[in-house]
Each structure stands twice: as C-alpha cells, then as structure tokens.
Design a protein with these regions (language model features):
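Active-site ligand-binding patch in enzyme domains
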Residues: 3, 7-14, 18-155, 164-167
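Gly/Thr-rich phosphate-binding loop signature of adenosyl cofactor/nucleotide-binding cores
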Residues: 159
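C-terminal structured "cap/appendage" subdomains that terminate the fold
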Residues: 173-174
Length: 174
C-alpha cells in the first residue's frame, strides 16, 4: 500500500526548543518563513497536527497566500486537515471543527475516542471525518493511519506537529 510522503515542518529557538519558555510557538519565525510555509501548505495534499497543537494554539491549518501579480496564486487551495487525537479531545468550538464543512477535515482517533459516539456524531454533523485506528500505547496507530490516508489518495502530508507527534512519526520511520 502506498503511503503519503511526509514533510516535517518545525521552527526552533536558538537554544533548541520548539516553543518559548511560555509555551508560545506561533512567532518563533519571521515573515519570510511564514510565507514559505504557506507555499508548503499549498503544495501538500494534507496537513497533520496533534491534539496538543490544536488545544494550545486553536490553529486553522489553512493556506493563506495573498493574491499576487508576480507569482502564480491562481491555484491556491487548502490542504486536507488531519488531527491525531487518540481520546477525541478536540473542542467542538475549535476553528478546525467550526470550518470543517468548508475545508476537508479528518480526526484520527482510537477506540477510546470513538467510544464517545455522541461526540463522533456531532463532529460528523459539522463535516469532520473520523478515522479509527488501532491503539498503540494509548496513541493513534500512525503506520495504519498513513496506509488509510494513502488509500484516500493523500500522497503528501505537511507535518506541523508538536514535539510528541513529530517524535512519534520519526520513531516510526514515517
């Protein structure tokens, strides 16, 4: 089975951290880096984050490229948003859930998360697709998830995870 190619994106402070001492990670980089990341988002079919990032930052995970006359911006599109959330803790009022009807959104969870069938139904009603994977030490089975995503035609993923998801993906060789 074909699995997506994964590009891991992260910013790091001079002392090797991916967030400031307050936990803020949004403004470690500058304007040029953020513009580059928007281009990466536009080129990848999917974008993946963990529930920790969603809870900490309430991100949109969209492609925000300004219309421009000096470059090709006619084909700007949003990647499919993929959130790894083993216990289905994603807030129903998060920006990702609130915009799931407009931007394709997948939440990958385990049996523990999927056991909240009422929340699953509410998320589905808002446009979220739920993928249930096997449980690996209390976490989403990332290898199984990649196979499922590849089967859905997602050939490239921009990984914008925090330390935990990034470590897990690298450890699994994904």
């Amino acid at each position: 089975n074909k699995q997506p190619y994964v590009t891991m994106k992260y910013a790091m402070t001079m002392d090797g951290r991916i967030a400031t001492h307050t936990g803020a990670s949004k403004w470690i980089t500058g304007e040029a880096s953020r513009a580059y990341v928007m281009g990466l988002r536009n080129r990848h079919k999917g974008i993946m984050a963990g529930i920790g990032t969603v809870l900490a930052d309430d991100p949109m995970l969209t492609c925000r490229i300004e219309k421009s006359t000096d470059r090709d911006t006619d084909n700007v599109r949003n990647p499919i948003r993929i959130v790894c959330d083993s216990k289905l803790r994603i807030p129903e009022d998060s920006q990702i859930v609130q915009t799931a009807g407009e931007i394709e959104t997948i939440v990958a969870t385990t049996a523990a998360g999927a056991s909240d069938s009422a929340k699953c139904e509410r998320l589905k009603d808002k446009g979220v697709s739920i993928i249930e994977t096997e449980d690996v030490d209390g976490q989403v089975n990332l290898r199984q998830l990649m196979t499922i995503l590849g089967g859905k035609g997602i050939d490239g993923i921009l990984l914008e995870g925090g330390g935990e998801l990034n470590y897990s993906m690298v450890s699994e060789g994904l």
